[in-house]
From Swiss-Prot:
Record domain MPN: where: 129-266
Gene: npl-4.2
Residues in RanBP2-type zinc fingers: 499-529
Localization per Swiss-Prot or TrEMBL: Cytoplasm; Nucleus
GO MF annotations, alphabetized: ubiquitin binding; ubiquitin protein ligase binding; zinc ion binding
Phenotype upon gene inactivation: Simultaneous RNAi-mediated knockdown of npl-4.1 and npl-4.2 causes embryonic lethality. In embryos, DNA replication is partially impaired causing a delay in S phase progression in P0, AB and P1 cells; simultaneous RNAi-mediated knockdown of DNA replication checkpoint kinases chk-1 or atl-1 suppresses the delay in S phase. During S phase, prevents DNA replication licensing factor cdt-1 down-regulation and causes cdt-1 accumulation on mitotic chromosomes.
InterPro entries: MPN (IPR037518), Npl4 (IPR016563), NPL4_C (IPR007717), NPL4_Zn-bd_put (IPR007716), Znf_RanBP2 (IPR001876), Znf_RanBP2_sf (IPR036443)
Role this protein plays: In association with ufd-1 and ATPase cdc-48.1 and/or cdc-48.2, involved in the cytoplasmic elimination of misfolded proteins exported from the ER. This pathway, known as ERAD, prevents the activation of the unfolded protein response (UPR) caused by the accumulation of misfolded proteins in the ER.
Subunit structure: Forms a complex composed of ubxn-3, ufd-1, npl-4.2 and cdc-48.1; within the complex, interacts with ufd-1 and ubxn-3. Interacts with ufd-1. Interacts with elc-1/elongin C; the interaction may mediate the interaction between the npl-4-ufd-1-cdc-48 complex and the E3 ubiquitin ligase cul-2 complex.
CDD domains for the chain: MPN_NPL4
Keywords linked to the UniProt accession: Chaperone, Cytoplasm, Metal-binding, Nucleus, Zinc, Zinc-finger
Keyword DNA damage appears in the UniProt entry: no
One Pfam family from the record: zf-NPL4
Protein name: Nuclear protein localization protein 4 homolog 2
Length: 529
């Protein structure tokens, strides 16, 4: 019996690949070279991926994680057997010390954490955030556009090699999952997500994972011109202390699995993206991570935000319990005379905790979901999850309207929609088995039209879900609950009066279909002449 290790406990494929690369940066023969083509000199010898002059020349602020590892391994010398140079930062007491009674009755230098001296992190776990296409983020921003309330979502995608940085890694975003949340004009509150394990299981079937989170901080400047205020800049703040603490909590929940640490984890690849106004007063996207030091302080629960100054954090003065230990935190800064002085971390600027990660979109958009251009002519869209507050409901009328846009041989296009797949596994009407969902996800990943058509024809759970949607759609959801797509075709299902349009009965399964369909939405067979 083969037991598969969960995705969250495996070394990521991109790390496995990069660990096999030599990382050397090849340099061509230059004008200062005085030797034959096959020879090398100091001007054209390959340089290491952590070479400071090369990084400065290419304007790379932080070396990549694997370049950082190579630098540590190289500093140990060729004869050493040290292969795990990464040591996790610790701000809490080491548990189960045998030398004394548990704290506060006893403490020693072995279990006591060292004084934290904040340093700007010189490397980053992720070197770039690439959002596949503009439609993806526009759909996310629609919630703020319709309600005026801020919104948060999890970035769904995968980690891939980033060729612009030596041994670099990029987070490619293919979809955005919007968890249960309470949204306000000036803030967001996470709510309990009862479907978290189910969603993670779906992501594993799709070969994807949560690579980060995104939130809006948009304030309308001129609604007619579509401009927003420029609020986050060097004279205010980039991330508030509260946002840094939240980012650190999420990074701690998504550790970076690596064989270069004795703990088998070090830091995190989980990224943070902020959607806010830029200098041109248009919505732009800015990427960050918090440092490993920040994540360690949050894990030890010694860091908290200040009340009126978002750019400052504060190290707790009073322990939360008798067993809670607060270590000292300090940082260096220049005083009014230009001299370096040490300051206590009460308060401390969050700029010491941040690592910039460039975020953007490729020149040529890519579509992991809704592949191809055939869907652009469709008038219906499948609603995003957890948007009941603005009247966007999944299932019922929305499912009927969305499904009616596709014939059976177009079921692959219908299923190549992250929010549709998410609804199949999280709806509270019909539970589709993991075996059937795995089969559909494999078809979506491979873009296998034949398998997708077979799934639509053979999956009884899908047939039952559609039957319930037709039953509920005819007498339940009102069309006003479903947002109207501009220039789209009107919904031809149930009307607000509850009357039904023309229907025809399938000669094979007797299902009542809407007029205009050429095949049965239940069994997929063509209409009889």
């Amino acid at each position: 019996m083969v037991i598969e290790v969960p995705q969250t406990e495996r070394v990521n494929d991109v790390d496995v690949f990069l660990s096999t690369q030599d990382g050397q940066i090849q340099r061509p023969k230059g004008p200062n070279c005085r030797h034959p083509v096959r020879q090398k000199c100091t001007n054209c010898l390959p340089v290491d991926p952590f070479d400071e002059e090369y990084l400065k020349e290419k304007d790379i602020k932080h070396m990549s994680f694997h370049a950082h590892v190579r630098k540590l391994l190289g500093s140990q010398g060729k004869g050493t057997t040290l292969k795990k140079p990464l040591e996790n930062f610790r701000c809490s007491l080491k548990p189960n010390c045998d030398a004394h009674k548990p704290f506060p009755k006893g403490i020693c230098t072995k279990c006591k954490p060292q004084v934290v001296t904040l340093n700007r992190q010189k490397f980053r776990h992720v070197d770039n955030i690439q959002i596949e296409n503009q439609e993806l983020v526009n759909q996310f921003l629609d919630y703020w556009r319709l309600s005026g309330h801020q919104r948060v979502g999890f970035l769904i995608g995968q980690y891939q090699p980033h060729l612009e940085v030596p041994l670099g890694i990029k987070a490619t975003v293919a979809a955005i999952y919007e968890p249960p949340q309470h949204c306000r004009e000036d803030g967001i509150e996470f709510l309990e997500d009862k479907n978290q394990k189910t969603i993670d299981n779906l992501l594993e079937m799709l070969g994807l994972q949560r690579v980060g989170w995104i939130f809006t901080d948009c304030w309308t400047a001129n609604s007619a011109e579509g401009t927003v205020h420029y609020t986050r800049h060097k004279d205010s703040f980039f991330l508030s202390a509260e946002e840094c603490i939240t980012a650190a909590m999420l990074q701690n929940q998504h550790p970076n699995i690596t064989e270069y640490s004795m703990d088998r984890h070090y830091g995190s690849k989980f990224v943070t993206v902020v959607a806010s106004g830029d200098e041109s007063m248009h919505v732009n996207f800015h990427g960050y991570q918090v440092s490993n030091q920040c994540a360690a302080m949050v894990e030890a629960d010694i860091l908290c935000p200040t009340l009126y100054t978002p750019e400052l954090a504060y190290v707790r003065e009073t322990p939360l319990s008798e067993e809670h230990y607060i270590t000292d935190v300090q940082f260096s800064m220049k005083n009014e005379y230009g001299a370096e002085v040490m300051k206590n971390g009460r308060p401390l600027p969050v700029e010491y905790l941040l690592v910039d990660v460039p975020a953007g979109m490729p020149k040529e958009p890519h579509y992991t979901f809704h592949v191809g251009t055939s869907n652009k002519s469709k008038s219906a869209k499948f609603n995003v999850e957890n948007r009941q507050a603005i009247g966007q409901l999944q299932g019922g009328a929305n499912l009927i309207q969305y499904s009616s846009e596709f014939s059976t041989n177009q079921f692959l296009e219908q299923a190549t929609n992250f929010h549709f797949l998410l609804y199949l596994v999280t709806n509270d009407q019909v539970q589709i088995s993991d075996e059937w969902m795995k089969r559909l996800c494999d078809a979506v990943k491979a873009q296998d039209r034949g398998t997708a058509m077979e799934w639509a024809q053979e999956c009884e759970d899908w047939h039952q879900l559609m039957a319930l949607a037709h039953a509920n759609g005819g007498s339940g959801n009102d069309v006003s609950d479903i947002p109207v797509i501009p220039n789209g075709d009107p919904f031809s299902g149930s009307s607000s009066g509850g009357s039904r349009g023309a229907v025809w009965s399938c000669g094979h399964c007797t299902f009542q279909n809407e007029a205009g369909r050429q095949d049965c939405s239940m069994c997929g067979l063509p209409a009889a002449d």
